[in-house]
């Protein structure tokens, strides 16, 4: 059985070691082939590591980092001045081949800037993209990109995103011939701006893609397509809107019992059970695609269960050697296109 080594930034995020360390314990218990390199401040975390039995764990190694990237730090400042931060060190471990993947719940902008600087882009990749799996009514998952790495794109970049997203759907989600769609304001070919219509032509001409046309925002979670492609501005707005709706629904289901009728309490209980699959913890972890290494961004406010899922995602991508798969597919698609 092959092993996957994941470097975990235990200092990152709004909560930090009090959640990342227990998440590491959970991930190790769920995945026997997983090895972890925990990166953080040794003096601050040693008592916590000892408490959770990780100091002498056979599948755990600790690497000290003297700095931490704050959630409010500007990316350019973090890139230039925080070279011994836990975030930077996990990326260095991936670059050096000591880790197969890395996970951080830290500052998103800083992570993207550092990842591009340390790991570099794959050959032919203009811009890396953030991708995330989302739940659908079909019970399967849809992957969506870009979710905020690039606020503006051209048609060629969206084509690259589509190819990379299709590889993720195939290798990580196990979907044969994934259906690829562009997010648009309508399903008709005449709908959308010039960028979306031009991108649709490129995707339609790409024989390596199973392009099914446009999908509207209200169908993102329908399960009608397996890969949804958009620029980072649109994708981030769509994702944050969906997260807000889920939070609102959860709060309504948890409305104070004393203020609800008997039937209201029953309805709230049934709602929680029926829609438990919508729990964002199950889908935590957005991957930065198009780099020469695997980088998974956990939500900054993620707790241990969610962080554990981000670690498992990183290990799964490492198992499938995702960057190599993407590089091979891009070379095949774009070499044929240039002929």
Swiss-Prot record:
Q: What class of enzyme is it?
A: transferase
Name a single GO biological process: phospholipid biosynthetic process
> Care to name a GO molecular-function term for this sequence?
phosphate:acyl-[acyl carrier protein] acyltransferase activity
Annotated compartments = Cytoplasm
EC number(s) given by UniProt: 2.3.1.274
Q: Which UniProt keywords apply?
A: Cytoplasm, Lipid biosynthesis, Lipid metabolism, Phospholipid biosynthesis, Phospholipid metabolism, Transferase
Q: Which Pfam families match?
A: FA_synthesis
What InterPro entries does its record include?
FA_synthesis, Phospholipid_synth_PlsX-like
Query: How does it associate, per the subunit comment?
Result: Homodimer. Probably interacts with PlsY.
Cited function:
Catalyzes the reversible formation of acyl-phosphate (acyl-PO(4)) from acyl-[acyl-carrier-protein] (acyl-ACP). This enzyme utilizes acyl-ACP as fatty acyl donor, but not acyl-CoA.
Q: Which family does it belong to?
A: Belongs to the PlsX family.
Name assigned to this protein: Phosphate acyltransferase
């Amino acid at each position: 059985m092959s092993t996957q080594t994941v470097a975990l930034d235990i200092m990152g995020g709004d909560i930090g070691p009090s959640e990342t360390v227990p998440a590491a314990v959970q991930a190790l218990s769920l995945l026997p082939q997983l090895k972890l390199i925990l990166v953080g401040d040794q003096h601050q975390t040693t008592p916590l590591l000892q408490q959770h039995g990780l100091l002498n764990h056979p599948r755990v190694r600790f690497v000290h980092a003297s700095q931490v990237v704050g959630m409010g730090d500007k990316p350019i400042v973090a890139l230039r001045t925080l070279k011994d931060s836990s975030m930077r060190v996990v990326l260095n471990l991936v670059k050096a081949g000591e880790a197969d993947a890395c996970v951080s719940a830290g500052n998103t902008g800083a992570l993207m800037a550092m990842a591009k600087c340390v790991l570099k882009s794959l050959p032919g990749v203009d811009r890396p993209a953030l991708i995330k799996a989302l739940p659908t009514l079909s019970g399967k998952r849809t992957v969506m990109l870009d979710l905020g790495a690039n606020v503006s794109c051209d048609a060629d970049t969206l084509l690259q995103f589509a190819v990379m997203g299709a590889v993720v759907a195939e290798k990580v989600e196990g979907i044969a011939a994934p259906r690829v769609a562009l997010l648009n304001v309508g399903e008709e070919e005449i709908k959308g701006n010039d960028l979306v219509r031009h991108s649709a032509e490129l995707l339609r001409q790409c024989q390596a893609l199973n392009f099914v046309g446009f999908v509207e925002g209200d169908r993102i979670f329908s399960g009608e397509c397996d890969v949804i492609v958009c620029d980072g501005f649109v994708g981030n707005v769509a994702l944050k809107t969906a997260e807000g709706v889920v939070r609102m629904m959860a709060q309504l289901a948890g409305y104070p019992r004393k203020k609800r009728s008997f039937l209201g309490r029953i309805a709230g209980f049934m709602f929680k059970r029926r829609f438990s699959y919508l729990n964002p913890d199950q889908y935590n972890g957005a991957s930065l695609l198009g780099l020469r290494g695997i980088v998974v961004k956990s939500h900054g406010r993620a707790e241990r269960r969610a962080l554990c899922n981000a670690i498992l995602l990183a290990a799964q991508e490492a198992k499938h050697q995702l960057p190599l798969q993407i590089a091979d597919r891009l070379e095949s698609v774009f070499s044929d296109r240039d002929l």
